[in-house]
Amino acid sequence: MYQLGLREFGENRDQEAVAKVDKLPKDIKWHFQGGIQSNKLKSIATWASCIHSVDQLKYAQIISDQNIAVAKPIFIQLSLDEPPESRGGVDPAKLFDLASSIEKLPGISLQGLMAVAPLTSPLNDSFARLRAIHDQFKAVYKNAIYLSAGMSGDYEMAISYGATHLRIGSSILGNR
């Protein structure tokens, strides 16, 4: 993929990324897209150019505390599940409060939202809801223009609803 000109890659496990980052070309921008564990976040902040799955203020605070020379781009993970937050992500009703708190932290640049389509709702409805929330979010947070949504099974629909970042690892690498 690198030979084809791609320079941005995602990883959802810290240990796997750490093993790759030092061995692969330095011009690669790594995105962390997996579930965050507090004990791994300091490591993730050292190699990830962007962290997509921040869903709690304490995680943003840990990133902020790393005193990184350049603000670390992050996305807030939004829950589209019912009940909210059952599979990770912040409840949409709490999104703006969380973003307001994160925005005040030094060393963080709020770039957008990330979401995983719920298992129980029609995809069209979920992506339409996500787009509407993202549109409202961008109206308040002008730099939060990116939308990380869509995986191997639904990325085409996610693109049609405004996704700018996709997570299609299993289509490329196969299932784990």
Where are these regions (language model features)?
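Conserved alpha/beta-domain cores
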Residues: M1-G153, Y161, L173
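Glycine-centered loop/turn positions within well-structured domains
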Residues: E156
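Expand to "…catalyze enediolate/carbanion chemistry for C-C bond making/breaking, isomerization
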Residues: I159-S160, I168, I172-R176
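Conserved, well-ordered active-site substructure
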Residues: H165
